[in-house]
């Protein structure tokens, strides 16, 4: 199976890697169709992301298709086109139990701390897949980026008629 590997800052390689294992209970095997490239990927490539783990297969903004599932998976089925929630949280620590999964004590981001989607296929927890019958693969790959903006609005809770100042010249804003 083909993959792109960021060996260390400013050094990509292409490689043939082993096929992923069959999914275990609660997991899904997906085929990658689209990968978004964002500021995190650029910073990782430039060596300016202090928590990047090298070598790594980048890619966390993904449009994928479900190929198979392990036991107990109910949120997706074979053939579903999905966006991927790339933040792998434990679900058990204090932060996760309070709903602050982004503050998980064991947080790992695919494509940053662990291998991501710049490969043909990979296995991940099925709970991190969000199916859509309407969005294109290109749109599915951008859902993660949209979610960041939506979370900002949700946290700020602006009301009708409120003035909002958006500061930032980054790729997401």
Task: Label the model's feature ranges.
Residues 2, 27-29, 163:
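Residues that mark the start of a beta-strand
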Residues 7, 19-20, 53-59, 110-114, ...:
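Short Gly/Pro-enriched turn/cap motifs at secondary-structure boundaries
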Residues 8-10, 24:
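Residue-level recognition of beta-strand termini and adjacent short loop/turns
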Residues 20-35, 48-94, 133-135:
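Glycine-rich beta-strand-centered segment in the early N-terminal region that forms part
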Residues 173:
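N-terminal Rossmann-fold NAD(P) dinucleotide-binding loop
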